[in-house]
Amino acid sequence: MDTSHTTKSCLLILLVALLCAERAQGLECYQCYGVPFETSCPSITCPYPDGVCVTQEAAVIVDSQTRKVKNNLCLPICPPNIESMEILGTKVNVKTSCCQEDLCNVAVPNGGSTWTMAGVLLFSLSSVLLQTLL
């Protein structure tokens, strides 16, 4: 038997075994409940075999006061996206998203301040200009 063929077969079997072992460890999700957006959350191994990582961004409005919080968790299925509801005079706007990759349920950053975005834009434009001049 050809040695290179045997080596390739062994490598293929090892690769398949590693890929299966990685998925057998379970889906990793961030988990926290009712925390401010900027709060970092610890990760957990999802206990559900076909579970999903869930991000919920909620704006709770009482009178004219708004409080924004997030929930990151693992669930067996993706919950329906209920965008707006009212509970006992309290309005709640919820945006729900689901994903099935490790640590994919991170809340989307808000983009930072106007000066930060202007600096990034200026840097991008200057690097393009520099490349065209060189």
Curated annotation (Swiss-Prot):
It comes from the Eukaryota. O-glycosylated. Not N-glycosylated. Not phosphorylated. Residues 27-119 form the UPAR/Ly6 domain. Its main location: membrane. SUPFAM superfamilies: Snake toxin-like. It is a lipid-anchor; GPI-anchor. A lipid is attached at G112 (GPI-anchor amidated glycine). Pfam families: UPAR_LY6. Disulfide bonds join C29-C53, C32-C41, C46-C74, C78-C98, C99-C104. GO terms for biological process: response to bacterium. Keywords: Cell membrane, Disulfide bond, Glycoprotein, GPI-anchor, Lipoprotein, Membrane, Signal. Widely expressed. Residues 1-26 form the signal peptide. Residues 113-134 form a propeptide. One of its GO terms (cellular component) is external side of plasma membrane. It is found in: Cell membrane. T-cell activation. This is Lymphocyte antigen 6A-2/6E-1.
